[in-house]
UniProtKB/Swiss-Prot annotation:
It comes from the Eukaryota. GO terms for biological process: attachment of spindle microtubules to kinetochore; chromatin organization; double-strand break repair; mitotic G2 DNA damage checkpoint signaling; mitotic spindle assembly; positive regulation of DNA repair; response to ionizing radiation. The keyword Protein transport does not apply. Phosphorylation of Ser-402 of the pSXXF motif by ATM or ATR constitutes a specific recognition motif for the BRCT domain of BRCA1. It comes from Gallus gallus. The gene is ABRAXAS1. It is found in: Nucleus. This is BRCA1-A complex subunit Abraxas 1. The lineage of its organism: Eukaryota, Metazoa, Chordata, Craniata, Vertebrata.
């Protein structure tokens, strides 16, 4: 959807000069307006992705050329006096955007003569967008101390004159604090000469800034470098993606192998019961019939069985143990040592202490020979300890001669 709108800007200095000229004379005044017209397209995109383009035309009135006498360039019928008009404009014909007229004690309505004159000016100046500024003044009080000044900007549109919104710019207006989309007032001739002298240092012949051109060149170079970097980054990202895919595949393969191992071998090991050490079980049952050790659970792999063994295997433990140990383990000294221990339990007094010392010496001499078969020593020492406890249960102060384990 496209639309058009027109607005006008009038400098505060120009408006002040027009008012001063009008109030300084006793008759009506008229003249020409200089400036330019600029168009700006505003594109608004809504949520429905529809473009709303509006073209805004801004009429910037920058200067004025006064005519110090009425009917100076036209007659009473509204016909133009071209030589007089050319003399008044004097080469500024292209800068004319309209004309103005001050009237006293009248309404804000264009007269028929003014309409004819405006039409003739459009044809002579070849400007169909020519505007007409009408200013009227009236006395508000009987003492003529207060005047009312009205102004309106008229523009022909489709055969009719329509009023155009006119804004008189001033230092106190908020619009001056924002960005200006139109040019300011006409610069002085001295400023124009200074800019023209140093123009070649900042501008090219086409009017573009040199710094802007250099920045654009740097921007293009950065874009080329960025394209190269993007291609390198793309290659690296693809390699990383490939590596991540391989890693995920390896992880899946490891998980499959673990699952297969658990389903095939792991579950089988968990279901199998550990084998029972029958010889050790029978030995513990023989030498510790009334001890809590008969409920202990022993296995080859050190794992706890679900059930406790309470079966008598009917194995002659002494025969089996004799076959399992070496001959050097059963020396004469050990046989004598066992006999002496049994006799020593029944004796009391100083002789028993001497025998105890001799037995301790014998134990230290034969200590290195006791590492071959731990099960035999455990059974013999445990049996001797049980016999001593049964023979002398009340003598709690007597020193224990059995080894502690």
């Amino acid at each position: 959807m496209e639309g058009e709108s027109t607005s006008a800007l009038l400098s505060g200095f120009v408006f002040g000069a027009l008012a001063f000229q009008h109030l300084s004379t006793d008759s009506d005044t008229e003249g020409f307006l200089l400036g330019d017209v600029k168009g700006e397209a505003k594109n608004s995109i809504t949520d429905s992705q529809m473009d709303d383009v509006e073209v805004v035309y801004t009429i910037d009135i920058q200067k004025h050329i006064p005519c110090y006498q009425l009917f100076s360039f036209y007659n009473s019928a509204g016909e133009l006096n071209e030589p007089a008009l050319k003399k008044i404009l004097s080469g500024r014909k292209k800068s004319v955007i309209g004309w103005y007229k001050f009237r006293r004690n009248t309404d804000q309505i264009m007269t028929f003569r003014e309409r004819l004159l405006h039409k003739n000016l459009q044809s002579h100046l070849s400007n169909q967008g020519l505007v007409f500024l009408l200013l009227t003044s009236s006395v508000m009080t009987e003492s003529c101390s207060t005047y009312r000044l009205e102004h309106a900007l008229h523009r022909p549109q489709e055969g009719l004159f329509q009023k155009v919104p006119l804004v008189v710019t001033n230092l106190g207006m908020a619009e001056q604090q924002g960005y200006r989309t139109v040019s300011g007032s006409c610069a002085s001739s001295g400023f124009v000469r200074a800019v023209k002298q140093h123009r070649s240092e900042f501008f090219y012949e086409d009017g573009s800034l040199q710094e802007v051109h250099k920045i654009n060149e740097m921007y293009a170079t950065l874009q080329e470098e960025l394209k190269k970097m993007c291609s390198d980054v793309e290659v690296s990202e693809r390699s990383v993606e490939k590596l991540l895919t391989e890693v995920s595949q390896l992880k899946e393969e490891i998980n499959r192998k673990k699952q297969h191992k658990i389903s095939s071998g792991g579950n089988k090991d968990q279901l199998e019961e550990p084998k029972e050490n029958v010889l050790l079980c029978q030995a513990l049952r023989t030498f510790f019939p009334s001890s809590d050790l008969q409920t202990c659970i022993v296995s080859f792999k050190g794992r706890i069985s679900k059930n406790c063994c309470k079966i008598d295997h009917n194995i002659n433990i002494m025969d089996k143990l004799t076959l399992m140990v070496e001959e050097r383990d059963f020396t004469e000294a050990e046989t004598k040592l066992v006999t002496k221990r049994k006799v020593r339990v029944t004796t009391t007094g100083p002789k028993s202490l001497k025998k105890l010392r001799s037995l301790q010496l014998d134990q230290e001499l034969h200590q290195d020979e006791e590492d071959c078969n731990q099960e035999t020593k455990l059974a013999l020492s445990s049996a001797e300890t049980d016999e001593e406890a049964l023979e002398n249960p009340k003598d709690t102060n007597e020193y224990s001669y059995s080894p502690t384990f």
